[in-house]
Each structure stands twice: as structure tokens, then as C-alpha cells.
């Protein structure tokens, strides 16, 4: 019954990782300016229609979620859509470091080609070391504790709408972060942009 409503086992990648790269980030979670380091990851949200997968891209400088996407299945396209949203929103120069775990979506040829085409530098956590991507995972933890609270949404559209509300109406513009001087990510960037001019 669980498989019929989309709650089968979590998809697993068979075979060894193919596109592994070094851990360039090396837990340096404090870049000096925006668009130097982005971290990305995927989580899942329960609905009565089955899973809703969320891919998010965070700028480590301010902890702002700069790109995100949702989908009913966990595919390479999901992570590419989130990264494309970040590129569209931020329009960074070349050389942005994009850090992820070693999931098959991030080791895929499509992901690596996308990064190369947009002059981005790939970085990956070491295998089995969740602390290497701890900041991205802490965002998902906050989302689940502060908004989802173990609820099961009636459908994927409702869940996606709530994710939008949390990220765009609360997390980025309002939620305070100790790493951002006790202000929201949007406010942190605004203050530092004014201070730099």
C-alpha cells in the first residue's frame, strides 16, 4: 500500500560514484562576500500523494536560500532547476564554488557539465561525512522544525506552497541568524552592501 501512494523505499544509486570531485570547501563556512560559495542539498517532505522533493541552494555568506525547486521525484533535473533559479536570481560572476554531497544527482555528467558551462567550481563532501555539508542540512532541519513539524500535507501542491511561504516570506527576509550578525539573510546582505559602497 505504501508503495502505491509513493512511499516506497528511498531511491538508491547503484554502482560507484562517477563524478567525484575534491572537497574544496573543506568546512570553510565563512566566505567574505556573496556569490563566492553556494551549498546545495535535497530533502523530502511527506504528503498523502507521496513524497515531495526539495532541492535548495544557499549562499554561505548570508545563509540566504538563493535558489530552490520542488518535484514529485528526485531527479537530476530537480537539482539543476534549483541551481538555475540561483543563477537567474543572483547573476554571479565566474568562479562560484558549489558544494554538495556525493549524491548521484551531483556526481552526474549533467551536473558537472552544467557547472562547467557556467564557470562554477564543484566541491563535494567526503563520503559519509555529514559535517562537510552541515549548513545546507541545518536549513532543512530548520524548515522541518519550524514549519513542517512532522505534518503530512494533503497534497504536493499544498506542501510546495508552504515551502515557498517559509523560504520567501520568512526564512530569507525575517528569520534571524547568529552567523549573519543576528539579522535575516536579506538584511545582512543589504547592510553589508551599503557598508561596502
Pin down the residues of each PLM region.
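Charged DNA-binding/catalytic regions of mobile-element recombinases
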Residues: 1-197
Amino acid at each position: 500500500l505504501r508503495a502505491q501512494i509513493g512511499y516506497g523505499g528511498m531511491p538508491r544509486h547503484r554502482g560507484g560514484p562517477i563524478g567525484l570531485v575534491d572537497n574544496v570547501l573543506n568546512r570553510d563556512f565563512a566566505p567574505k562576500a556573496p556569490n563566492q560559495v553556494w551549498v546545495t542539498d535535497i530533502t523530502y517532505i511527506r504528503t498523502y500523494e507521496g513524497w515531495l522533493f526539495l532541492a535548495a541552494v544557499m549562499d554561505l555568506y548570508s545563509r540566504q536560500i538563493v535558489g530552490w525547486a520542488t518535484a514529485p521525484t528526485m531527479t537530476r533535473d530537480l537539482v539543476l532547476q534549483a541551481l538555475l533559479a540561483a543563477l537567474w536570481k543572483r547573476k554571479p560572476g565566474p568562479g562560484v564554488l558549489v558544494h554538495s554531497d556525493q549524491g548521484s544527482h551531483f556526481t552526474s555528467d549533467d551536473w558537472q557539465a552544467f557547472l562547467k558551462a557556467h564557470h562554477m567550481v564543484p566541491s563535494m563532501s567526503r563520503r559519509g561525512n555529514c559535517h562537510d555539508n552541515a549548513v545546507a542540512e541545518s536549513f532543512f532541519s530548520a524548515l522541518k522544525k519550524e514549519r513542517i513539524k512532522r505534518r503530512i500535507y494533503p497534497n504536493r501542491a499544498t506542501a510546495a506552497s508552504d515551502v515557498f511561504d517559509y523560504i520567501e516570506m520568512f526564512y530569507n527576509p525575517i528569520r534571524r541568524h547568529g552567523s549573519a550578525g543576528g539579522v535575516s539573510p536579506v538584511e545582512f546582505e543589504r547592510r553589508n552592501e551599503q557598508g561596502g559602497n
